[in-house]
Amino acid sequence: MRMEKDYSIFFQLIRLGLGISDEAVGIPMEAWKGLYKEAERQSMLGVVFEGVNRNVNLGGTKPPTALVLKWMGISQVIKRKNVKFDVEAKRLTQLFDENGIFTVILKGQGNELLYPVRGCRIPGDIDIFVDGGKDFVVDWIDRHGLADRAEKATYHHVHLLPGASGIDIEVHFLPSSGLFFPTHRHRLQRFLQSEVRNSVMCDRGFRIPSAMFNLLMQLAHIHCHFFSGGIGLRQMNDFYYVLMSSSKDERVEAMALIRKMGMRNTAAALMWVLKEVFFMDAEWMLCSPDESLGNVLLGEVFKGGNFGHYLFDNEEAFFLKAVLRRKRFLKLLRFGVLETIGQMWFDTMYIVKKLI
């Protein structure tokens, strides 16, 4: 992927917003619309707006007034949403605690705690791990009138009915959706099921996972979304702070497990992206960055946007999308043959289910 000038500006605004850089940047007036659109595509509007403000304070270019007012309004909405999500995460934790059920908030609001500027990360939904296994958890939420009966539970999660908060809530009875190749998936789940017990209660009233849990679970999350349709910068920004919150010993131990779980190449690609976008120092990395694989990963980020929502045209026919995904699998082989084979099997089963 050739790094275009606007992408360099976009990266610098992210670094400014996160306090990684103090270097102001000049921005052509015609570039502002594209910068805003990319921040929206990547679900990074809050972080980039923090960067815009710092850039102006450091003597950089001011954006058009109309755009500032629009962006400022959205930034305030993001801050209020984060407060709302924290309150709901605490409520859910208390609900299950009162019934003697162990829970942990995954990703989301736990990641937001790691950001130096609070309230700038855009929340999506609440993922909560509930201990007890699928049968117990599904039965419990059904008996308490919390289950969305219109939706069948998947192998790892079920949605709750929309409550007064209106927040989308996924109850997970497995700590991760897993990996694609069966052996890798089993190793990941076995590790996470044990490590989830090392979670701690944060000052906002909900449990958050350990650094080791986050290193494995969130890399697997990025890996799976990248393999199955795309990933965005927000998830990579999250992983940057997961790494920064870990110790050297934890990173060494995590990398040994990552190799056994078939994610080594994904980790190497991600380290290059974190170096390129967030200026991450080598001492915080899991492994040596791979520029070639990193270019592929970063290219997918800008092609697909947050979670790959823009990767395929919504108007494209179902079977055409299936063909395009198979063409994409050839690219994924470089990231792991076994994982690619596993993903092809998952995708084939998905198509079969759609047809019957």
Region locations from a protein language model:
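Conserved NTP-donor binding/palm subdomain of two-metal-ion nucleotidyltransferases/polymerases, i.e.
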Residues: M1-G124, F129-I356
